[in-house]
A protein has these predicted regions:
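Carbohydrate-active catalytic/glycan-binding domains of CAZyme proteins
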Residues: 1-498
Length: 498
């Protein structure tokens, strides 16, 4: 038996399809690059990386963190994934560019061809109907359907365009997160919204035997798994080779992010019923199409001797001129590009997702090439970030902790002056039951771990709209050209933390 949640990592807005014996899932990656990650599975429970659809999106100044600009909380949102007549299709909007992107490929691992669809389709979902007509369903509060032209570049002239359902004036959250599927002659639209009297993510489904007819239905799941009042919702359904059906949704889980949840679906009179007696089961059984298959981990340690592993993503577009990976030495080096006021504007910050319910990371930093005022180290990346690192001040090396508060105030705790320019840093995070706390440590010459600063409170906020991540960073506060060298990154999950 398998236990929910499945990945225990921040993979929000999941969309899952099956092609023969393989399941594929796409998820929102926002401002992290490369972007639009695709995972694969043979049992819907265990997942591994397949590919990223793009290295960078449009390479705008904001996507590159230039001139104080950024795309936090924007970037690529809520992609849908389809397989139609031998081709894969992925479509999403980017909230910073206000464009709708469509990528296509004959193979799941690419190469992917990029094009635009005229218009902006929030949380869109594509339908290839059996008569050869193409549609996109989308919207917030009001859910619309628009017929697209044959080459999927724009709405079809005089094509179908109509309102399907509405949750207008819902004070919490109206319908969005559209997933449209045609199953046994019926059209199904799966949506997320909130209860009107309080914040509670809820899954809804409407169906019709015609795109021009009335869509009927309602809520199909309102359950928080007994977890902090955080509802499970948003996603579609997928069938197995033996004819069973499952839904892949997600649950807000505090600062660690939004985590996928898997639950069974059964059919009665052409309508889907989610879970077991209306609730998400703690345990779920799914038969693997490839029993015994060994999956590559989605997060983990790295000695940097094998290139940049796919578990790493950059915060915004990387600038290859200012980072260097030395596989022979096992090092990742960041050189500062411009003076920054704080960590979130640092270029080439390398990140990995944190994991529920707790995790820790360690890294060794060589600060010998820092310039005056430079800061380098290990962070818990979000808008209210925590970081432990080393700085060069009046020609001497000092340990420090950075503590960004919810009110925007940045506190700095300075440790002792150290003689060594090489140090180890450790960051521990506890997300259990939304405790959402981080602690920072350092050590010199492989001695004892020494705490620095106070316990830091982590938050999931809409300004970044992503789960907290470990990050390796280096930025300049006075002059550019300094650098920091990282090696021996170690990742510990809940069972390995000592």
């Amino acid at each position: 038996m398998n236990v929910n949640p499945i990945t225990r990592l921040d993979y929000p807005d999941p969309d899952v399809i099956r092609v023969e014996d393989t399941y594929y899932m796409v998820s929102t990656t926002m401002h992290f690059m490369p972007g639009c990650e695709i995972l694969q599975s043979f049992d819907l429970v265990h997942w591994e990386h397949v590919t990223y659809v793009y290295e960078t999106l449009d390479h705008t100044d904001a996507q590159q963190l230039k001139s104080g600009q950024n795309i936090y909380g924007q970037g690529m949102w809520a992609a849908f994934l389809r397989y139609h007549e031998g081709r894969f299709y992925i479509c999403f909007v980017a909230n910073d560019t206000r464009k709708t992107y469509l990528y296509t490929s004959e193979k799941i691992d690419g190469p992917w061809k990029k094009q635009l669809i005229e218009g902006f389709y929030h949380d869109g979902s594509l339908l290839f109907d059996e008569d050869g007509r193409n549609y996109i369903v989308y919207g917030n509060d009001e859910i619309w359907i628009t017929e697209l032209n044959e080459d999927l570049t724009a709405p079809k002239k005089e094509g179908l365009h109509r309102l399907l359902v509405s949750d207008h004036k819902n004070p919490e959250l109206g319908y969005e997160g559209s997933h449209i599927q045609k199953i046994n002659g019926y059209y199904y639209i799966f949506l997320i919204h909130s209860l009107r009297d309080r914040w509670m993510r809820t899954e809804a489904c409407f169906y019709s035997d015609s795109l021009e007819g009335e869509f009927t239905g309602g809520d199909v799941l309102c359950d928080d798994r007994g977890y902090c009042g955080q509802g499970v919702a948003q996603g579609g359904i997928v069938d197995t080779p033996d004819g069973k059906w499952y839904a892949m949704l997600f649950q807000d889980s505090g600062a660690v992010g939004r985590i996928p949840i898997l639950l069974p679906v059964i059919w009665k009179d052409h309508f889907p019923f989610f879970g077991q007696n209306g609730h998400v089961p703690e345990e779920i059984e799914v038969h693997s199409t490839r029993p015994g298959y060994i999956y590559q981990p989605l997060v983990g340690s790295d000695d940097f001797c094998n290139g940049l592993l796919p578990r790493w993503q950059f915060n915004h577009d990387p600038d290859p001129r200012y980072y260097h990976l030395d596989a022979l030495q096992g090092t990742y080096t960041i050189t500062t590009r411009e003076v920054c006021t704080e960590l979130t504007q640092a270029v080439n910050t390398l990140t990995q997702r944190m994991s529920y319910p707790s995790c820790a990371a360690e890294v060794t930093v060589d600060a010998s090439a820092l310039k005056e005022g430079d800061v380098a180290g290990l962070c818990a990346l979000q808008s209210c970030y925590a970081a432990v690192g080393i700085t060069k001040h009046h020609g001497k090396y000092e340990v420090l902790m950075l503590d960004k508060k919810e009110d925007g105030i940045l506190d700095m705790t300075e440790g002792t002056v150290v003689e060594s320019h090489q140090m180890d840093f450790r960051l521990e995070a506890d997300f259990c039951n939304m405790k959402d706390e981080a602690r920072c440590y350092y050590r010199v010459n492989k001695g004892d771990w020494l705490p620095i600063g106070t316990v830091h409170k982590l938050y999931f906020k809409l300004d970044h709209f992503t789960g907290c991540r470990f990050g390796l960073f280096c930025y300049a506060t006075e002059e550019t050209g300094g650098s920091a060298c990282f090696r021996d990154f170690k990742y510990y999950d809940v069972d390995e933390i000592s």
